[in-house]
């Protein structure tokens, strides 16, 4: 669940996730973020004043702006431009093997995987790159794999209003590989279907067959 983030200048234009908002937080400034990283270095037993770590707080804060850039983007903007002159094409549009990375909301360690996304157009289509961008918008947030899967499908269904959407995500979770049970190489698969993909088994079979070919 996202909290609305207020900019230092009280700009409330950043998109809010569809989940209900229970808290409103003021976004910390860059200096506060860097100070927080410095505190973590001290807590880990490091000396933030040694040569190799002097610029680390600044670098981490800058990296987080990119890694969690999905909070400042909205699928509505990405999927807002569509095309209707597609020669009557109304069959499945599938973009598969979309590589992505995200971060587990429980431990803030990476989730690395691939997404396969399909939809059945209802008179209009979007540029193929837009589907990949929607994946990145939700991946570049603190997430669970189940949430990313559902959010991708929901946004495409809600904005494009196709006859159906299918999403499969295959990913490795570093919280399982690097800590706790330390099971390297294990993968998690999640799926969600809407519309015809949910109601018609043959459409699900087509989707699953195509992503495996």
Swiss-Prot record:
Pathway the protein acts in: Cofactor biosynthesis; 7,8-dihydroneopterin triphosphate biosynthesis; 7,8-dihydroneopterin triphosphate from GTP: step 1/1
MF GO annotations: GTP binding; GTP cyclohydrolase I activity; zinc ion binding
Enzyme class (EC, first level): hydrolase
Catalysed conversion reaction: GTP + H2O = 7,8-dihydroneopterin 3'-triphosphate + formate + H(+)
Alphabetically ordered keywords of this record: GTP-binding, Hydrolase, Metal-binding, Nucleotide-binding, One-carbon metabolism, Zinc
Annotated disulfide bonds: none
Enzyme Commission number(s): 3.5.4.16
Pfam families registered for this protein in UniProt: GTP_cyclohydroI
Residues annotated for Zn(2+) binding in this entry: 104, 107, 175
GO CC term, one of those recorded: cytoplasm
Family (UniProt): Belongs to the GTP cyclohydrolase I family.
Name of the protein: GTP cyclohydrolase 1
